[in-house]
């Protein structure tokens, strides 16, 4: 159990780093990227799925219209899923925008599928209404699609806090910095294991039917492309910036959704667990995703119980040390929770708390899936 926990959170990253270093030693470092010229760029749609986003329409459109991409090759599509605020009315002020409206709220996956049916360009990039992307993002994405092995491009998610000391945002940001490093190395080894919905793009000719009840539409859509034999290329040079969750309660909504969606995807993508089909993909997928979403949270509990029994039966000093370290870590987590509730800040204690918080939400995701597994609609986490 200890080895499973270590491998999931540290060991895979260490192993991946060693493999990448060896690969660079024999094949050299990746060449410096050169962005394609206007003539080389393919047509692309930026699709934004929205539910009641009237507060961010103006900011999002200002960001979108400032992107560096030829206007004759670029389309903007907003898919509004059951919005009952002023989102549609505000969008009508922009003649550049194609508005695809569904009066019924069926969830983001159904909205994406609705938008894809209206698509008229070679590629499509997806982004959220509340995220801002860098000026060269779409050119960078187009550059990576010039590789015929690439069927999906994942940008980088960056999390910002509106003011210093917002611990929920800082915890989320720390997690995504680690996650982005793993994605970069995964991509360099072969393929990233999934794309983040804040910014990713696909070749629509490779789209696989994603169930409407999918909670992780971005992950499912991108991994179906890997399943079909293409790669997900990851680039930090195309990034989406969003503010972190307003507080730990709001962040819990996101973690619960990710956990529930992760369990859904393990079942729907179970053929990818077969090492005889795609050996390298199976290794990356199990190591980076499956263990974290299913096995390891349970292993943490079993590890503590078994370790306690071994100490009780006086098996050896090593197990006493391991139990003390575990209890100390959980006490640090408890202290981090206590301080956070009172508005105090301690990064070390909060990091321990955030780790435990993530794993608790895996079990909450399991419970959610049992009671709400047939709906793809989800309550949005309020941002800071």
How would you label these PLM feature ranges?
Residues 1-36:
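N-terminal membrane-anchoring/stem segments of glycan-assembly enzymes
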Residues 45, 63, 77-88, 104, ...:
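A conserved acidic beta->alpha catalytic loop
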Residues 20, 101-104, 110-111, 117, ...:
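Long helical/loop segments within the catalytic core of UDP-sugar-dependent glycosyltransferases
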Residues 56-59, 73, 84-93, 136:
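Acidic helix N-cap motif at the loop->helix transition within catalytic regions
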Residues 145-178, 213-217, 222-288, 354, ...:
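Catalytic donor/gating beta->alpha subdomain of glycosyltransferases that bind UDP-sugars
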Residues 18, 22-26, 38, 242, ...:
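Membrane-embedded multi-pass helical conduit in multi-pass membrane proteins
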Residues 62-73:
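Short, acidic, metal-binding catalytic loop of nucleotide-sugar glycosyltransferases
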Residues 42-45, 75, 220:
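Cell-envelope/extracellular polymer assembly enzymes that use nucleotide-activated donors
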């Amino acid at each position: 159990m200890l080895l499973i926990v270590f491998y999931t959170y540290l060991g895979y990253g260490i192993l991946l780093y060693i493999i990448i270093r060896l690969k660079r030693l024999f094949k050299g470092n990746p060449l410096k990227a050169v962005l394609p010229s206007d003539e080389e760029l393919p047509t692309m749609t930026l699709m934004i799925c929205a539910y009641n986003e009237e507060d961010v329409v103006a900011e999002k459109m200002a960001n979108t219209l400032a992107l560096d991409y030829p206007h004759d090759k670029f389309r903007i599509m907003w898919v509004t899923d059951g919005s009952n605020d002023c989102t549609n009315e505000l969008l009508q002020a922009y003649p550049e925008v194609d508005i695809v409206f569904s009066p019924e709220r069926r969830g983001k996956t159904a909205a994406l599928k609705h938008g894809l049916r209206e698509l008229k360009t070679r590629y499509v990039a997806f982004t959220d209404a509340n995220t801002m992307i860098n000026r060269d993002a779409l050119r960078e994405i187009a550059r990576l699609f010039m590789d015929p092995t690439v069927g999906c491009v994942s940008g980088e998610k960056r999390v910002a806090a509106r003011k210093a000391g917002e611990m929920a945002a800082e915890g989320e940001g720390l997690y995504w910095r680690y996650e982005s490093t793993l994605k970069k190395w995964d991509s360099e080894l072969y393929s990233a294991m999934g794309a983040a919905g804040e910014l990713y793009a696909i070749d629509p000719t490779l789209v696989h039917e994603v169930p409407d009840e999918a909670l992780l539409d971005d992950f499912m859509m991108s991994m179906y492309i890997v399943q079909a034999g293409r790669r997900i290329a990851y680039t930090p040079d195309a990034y989406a910036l969003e503010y972190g969750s307003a507080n730990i309660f709001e962040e819990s909504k996101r973690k619960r959704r990710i956990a529930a969606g992760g369990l859904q995807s393990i079942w729907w993508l179970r053929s990818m667990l077969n090492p005889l089909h795609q050996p390298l993909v199976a290794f990356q997928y199990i190591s980076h995703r499956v263990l974290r979403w299913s096995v390891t949270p349970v292993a943490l509990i079993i590890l503590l119980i078994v370790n306690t029994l071994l100490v009780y039966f006086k098996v050896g000093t090593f197990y006493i040390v391991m139990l003390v370290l575990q209890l100390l870590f959980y006490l640090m987590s408890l202290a981090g929770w206590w301080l956070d509730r009172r508005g105090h800040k301690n990064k070390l204690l909060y990091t321990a708390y955030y780790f435990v918080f993530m794993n608790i939400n895996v079990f909450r995701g399991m419970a959610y899936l049992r009671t709400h597994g047939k709906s793809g609609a989800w309550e949005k986490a309020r941002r800071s």
